[in-house]
């Protein structure tokens, strides 16, 4: 007799998840200040540059990416891991987000999904919105550089990444 044991997810997970907000506001207002009459005074500025995230685990891991519309409209969001050169881009009318709506992409193995959440809390599976070159972006061990955008109004997008640190078992 032979007994086979299959473990599809043989990793221990860190108790604490790491969260990174890619699109952040940076303070621009300082005291003392001077102002020219008729010119606006910048209070803050959105930062759209690349962000670094460290995968402290010993193996590549997926993540949960949340694209949330914080302005009137945005559409066709994408995320690129510049370290691994992987890009996930969403296309089609289902990817248009009105203020308060969000798209959540889970790239963790055995949990792959793309779900749109509407402002009333209802959800819809939009797995069919993957671009033809879509990749389930993974984080390599060590430092990863991520960037994001959207084909329409990327300034209306708030992007949050949540990562589990995977640890090898015995």
Where are these regions (language model features)?
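Oligomerization/assembly interface segments of phage tail-like spikes and tubes
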Residues: 1-10, 144
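Short, charged, solvent-exposed linker or helix-capping segments at domain edges/interfaces
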Residues: 13-20
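Short acidic/polar capping segments at secondary-structure boundaries
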Residues: 8-12, 70-72
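Intrinsically disordered, low-complexity segments enriched in serine, threonine, and glycine
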Residues: 20-170
């Amino acid at each position: 007799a032979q007994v086979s044991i299959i473990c599809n997810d043989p990793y221990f997970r860190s108790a604490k998840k790491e969260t990174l907000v890619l699109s952040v506001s940076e303070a621009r207002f300082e005291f003392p200040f001077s102002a020219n009459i008729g010119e606006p005074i910048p209070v803050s500025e959105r930062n759209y540059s690349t962000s670094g995230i460290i995968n402290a685990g010993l193996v590549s891991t997926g993540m949960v990416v949340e694209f949330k519309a914080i302005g009137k409209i945005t559409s066709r969001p994408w995320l690129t891991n510049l370290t691994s050169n992987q890009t996930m881009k969403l296309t089609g009318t289902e990817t248009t987000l009105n203020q308060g709506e969000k798209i959540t992409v889970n790239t963790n193995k055995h949990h792959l999904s793309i779900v749109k959440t509407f402002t009333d809390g209802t959800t819809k599976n939009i797995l069919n919105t993957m671009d033809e070159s879509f990749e389930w972006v993974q984080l390599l061990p060590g430092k990863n550089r991520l960037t994001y955008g959207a084909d329409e109004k990327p300034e209306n997008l708030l992007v949050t990444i949540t990562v589990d640190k995977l640890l090898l078992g015995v």
